[in-house]
Each structure stands twice: as structure tokens, then as C-alpha cells.
């Protein structure tokens, strides 16, 4: 399979790609996501549009420097009734987010973009629907105490392939999408463009 640059520092995305036989080099794109999100929200962009735009901006930024390579950018956001929920900045923020999601259904949206020479050549967005159990504050605090800082910031508050699975009464959708990378569609694209 083709070598690709992953424009992300996400260890989980790297592991998903490698586990699926995709040879990658990691080169995180240092874009200021908060500024981009604020600008898009000001223009009334949906969480899905924000996710798509961030994935594309990340991929394009690196592909402008590495013009002969395919560059994969990715982004995941939570959509709670149209409200964009971003990654927590610290554990207190994570607890606030979990309390907001507590007992409710939300969408986890993951977008991927492949760029070459500064231009998007392919993109895909997938959604999963997650329904969180109605948990006590103490149960949420116990969950947060069990996970590492790295997991906390990398998984949109919950680590679905680990302890986070226990937070949910219902999970609909691809687990790889929830972990931030709809790998089946990426593989389909790469296999059809060898």
C-alpha cells in the first residue's frame, strides 16, 4: 500500500492506520483549531462542516510542504443537538463535558481528507450515534480518575475501546469512526488509487 503522511499527532489514528497495513510518516499540522472553529461557528457552520474543514485544513497545510506525498488530515467533533463539543482542555473541563453528555444521545463525527500539493483530492465524513448512560457525578469522577491524560485529550472525553465503553447504554456506528478514523473508507480509496 502507498506511503502516506498523517497530519496528526494522534497515537490512536497512527495505530489504526498501521494495524491496517498503511505505511505512514507522522507530521502533525499545527493549526489553531480554536480560531478556525470560532470563525466557522460565526458563519453558522454545522459541527459536520467544522469537522470536514478542519480535516482539510490540516491535510492541505502539510501537503503544501510535502507536495509529492499524499497527506491525510482528520478531525473528530461531538454534536450534541447542534452544539459543537470540543476536546477538553483539562480534567475539570472533561467533567463538565461528561455532565453535559450524561444521559443523552449525541453524534460523534469523524472527517478525513487526503490532499496532495495543497489540494484536497478525497474526503469522507462518518457519524456514530452514542447514547450515554445516566450516571452520577461520582461515577463520572471515577471514570476520569481511571484514564490517562493522553487518553482524555485524544478521544473526545471518552476512550471507547477501553473504559469509555462503560459510559454508554447504546453505540451505533463504526468503532474506528468513534476512535477518529473511518478506516474502511480510507482503505477503499487507497486501494482504488494505487
Regions inferred by a protein language model and the residue ranges of each:
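Active-site-adjacent loop/tail segments of enzyme domains
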Residues: 76-106, 132-134
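Anionic-ligand binding region
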Residues: 111-115, 119-122, 127
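Amphipathic, non-transmembrane alpha-helical scaffold segments
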Residues: 51-52, 98, 176-179
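Short beta-strand-to-turn element immediately C-terminal to the catalytic PLP-Schiff-base lysine
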Residues: 79, 113-116, 170
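Generic enzyme active-site microenvironment
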Residues: 73
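N-terminal polybasic phosphate/anion-binding patch
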Residues: 1-70, 84, 138, 142-145, ...
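GST superfamily/GST-like fold recognition
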Residues: 1-22, 104, 127-194
Amino acid at each position: 500500500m502507498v506511503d502516506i503522511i498523517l497530519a496528526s499527532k494522534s497515537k490512536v489514528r497512527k495505530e489504526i492506520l498501521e494495524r491496517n497495513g498503511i505505511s505512514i510518516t507522522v507530521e502533525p499540522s499545527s493549526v489553531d483549531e480554536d480560531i478556525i472553529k470560532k470563525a466557522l461557528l460565526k458563519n453558522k457552520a454545522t459541527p459536520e462542516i467544522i469537522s470536514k474543514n478542519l480535516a482539510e485544513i490540516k491535510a492541505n497545510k502539510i501537503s503544501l510542504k510535502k507536495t509529492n506525498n499524499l497527506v491525510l488530515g482528520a478531525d473528530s467533533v461531538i454534536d450534541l443537538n447542534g452544539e459543537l463539543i470540543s476536546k477538553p482542555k483539562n480534567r475539570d473541563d472533561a467533567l463538565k463535558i461528561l455532565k453535559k453528555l450524561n444521559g443523552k444521545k449525541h453524534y460523534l463525527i469523524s472527517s478525513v481528507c487526503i490532499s496532495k500539493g495543497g489540494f484536497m483530492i478525497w474526503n469522507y465524513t462518518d457519524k456514530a450515534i452514542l447514547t450515554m448512560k445516566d450516571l452520577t457525578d461520582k461515577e463520572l469522577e471515577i471514570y476520569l480518575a481511571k484514564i490517562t491524560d493522553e487518553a482524555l485529550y485524544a478521544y473526545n472525553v471518552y476512550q471507547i475501546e477501553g473504559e469509555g465503553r462503560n459510559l454508554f447504554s447504546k453505540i451505533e456506528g463504526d468503532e474506528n469512526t468513534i476512535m477518529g478514523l473511518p478506516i474502511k473508507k480510507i482503505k477503499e480509496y487507497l486501494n482504488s488509487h494505487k
